[in-house]
Amino acid sequence: MGRAAAIAFAREGADVAINYFPSEEEDAWQVMTLIKEAGRTGVAIPGDLREQSFCRKMVEDAVAELGGLDILVNNAARQQSCESVADLTAEDFDATMKTNIYAPFWTVQAALPHLKPGSAIIATASEQAYDPSPELYDYAQTKAATMNYVKSLAKQLAKRGIRVNGVAPGPIWTPLQVSGGASMEKLEKFGSQSPLGRPGQPAELASIYVQLAAADASYTTGNIYGAGGGQGQP
């Protein structure tokens, strides 16, 4: 979803900085190519968001390369399926919390000094926040937290003219599912129970991120926008 959103922003005229794990360099440079084909500047910043020092450096590097910061999208997430809470290790739980809760917190803190009135912060929540799956105990917690940080931060930053909103995807095909985020049984039926009868593609919700950042969405803040193919919404 981050890839689709980055490309959508570039095609609407934004210069874009993205973060990626060093092991994902080939994918990152594919995104850079598409951003440049759109006639915009692309900046790829490798590193681990679970480290506070890196989150700070990432923001500073993005500001330096882009000449400022107007939009912050917190999209990175960790999702691992675990059938029983008894089998969930403290290490796995901690990794999910660091990626899904700590990293956005650190990134927002680092970005705030650079965000001027009219800026926007957008978070990726999930339908798991309000309709959690039993095997996603830790992930679902983090997405409920994401919904609430959107609503709380929107109230806090309103007086500064900074809007905060979230996007809550339903069954969207992303690397999360095939890298341990869902069982094979779940993958075989993924998205089939939605009213549309299929999973969505990241490109089908990328425009929501763009609209939430747009100047003509200036009265929209503290909201969570669902994209679930017709199933439960926040």
Predicted regions and their residues:
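Active-site helix of classical SDR
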Residues: V108, T142, V150
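Short C-terminal tail/terminal secondary-structure segment
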Residues: C82, D131, S192-L196, Y209-V210, ...
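Residue(s) in the substrate-gating loop at a strand-loop-helix junction
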Residues: S126
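Substrate-binding pocket helix/loop in short-chain dehydrogenase/reductase
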Residues: E83-V85, T89-D94, F190
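Canonical Rossmann dinucleotide-binding motif of NAD(H)/NADP(H)-dependent dehydrogenases/reductases
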Residues: M1-A17
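Short, small/polar-rich loop/turn modules that mediate ligand/substrate recognition or access, typified
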Residues: A158, R163, T220-G222
